[in-house]
């Protein structure tokens, strides 16, 4: 039986013709039956693809033949092509949408002026040496942090990466500008950019974790400074670094520990992802995001004895 895997990767390198790279990558993935999402810009490439393990290996080999991608690191994860609805390869102004394409500078070595890279062991060593002075700064959307984060991390109030510039310019975090700040995100790419944006705005000692949460979790599992589950952007929705993980998220209705995000049942104008335990999700009356309109719709379904999951 064939073994499937998911690849996560990115590279910051100048690309003079992103459209040509797009066409090449699409043809390569289609020839190998890979599915997933790839973004390309003049700053580089950002991708997550899944498929048969041998096809993934062939993809790595072929992609590294491109001069700008020859040192690109690939992270392996559980899953496969079935975790993605299709293959999407697009050209964008940014490979991560911070809304600052003209501010970001890259050369053949990566992002210019970004935070100092720390390997997972060096993160622990920094905390051991500097103690509570070290601040972990979450570079993801606030929703992702609901099910897992570094211990005592600062979690900015952002819904998308586009919100980060306004958030760090708000003054809320000015007291961190003279402290050692360790930015972190899923695989590292968001912090390549975020750390440079923070340095440009007066943060003096900024770090980023090589390989992000994924690499840290692979090395230390649940025995290090990471707590909970890792949110991922595919059908799995979350992953853990061993069976002994701690559930840090809580159901919005009954406060039961859970790491499961579910969609609000209001399909017409909501569908928000919220944390719900299995019991509250199974109950039509509580299968909502707690907004007044959505709660009323859920109550109406319950009163009529209708379950949208059964009738749809």
From Swiss-Prot:
UniProt EC number: 1.14.-.-
The catalytic residues are: 185 (cysteine persulfide intermediate)
Q: Which UniProt keywords apply?
A: Oxidoreductase, tRNA processing
- As recorded in UniProt, coiled-coil segments are none
Q: Which GO terms describe its molecular function?
A: oxidoreductase activity, acting on paired donors, with incorporation or reduction of molecular oxygen
Catalytically driven reaction(s):
uridine(34) in tRNA + AH2 + O2 = 5-hydroxyuridine(34) in tRNA + A + H2O
Q: Which SUPFAM superfamilies does the annotation name?
A: Rhodanese/Cell cycle control phosphatase (SSF52821)
The EC category is oxidoreductase
- Known CDD domains for this protein? RHOD_YceA
Entry's Gene Ontology BP terms: tRNA modification
> Start and end of every Rhodanese domain?
130-225
Q: Which family does it belong to?
A: Belongs to the TrhO family.
User: Could you tell me which HAMAP family the record lists for this protein?
Assistant: TrhO
**Listed name of the protein:** tRNA uridine(34) hydroxylase
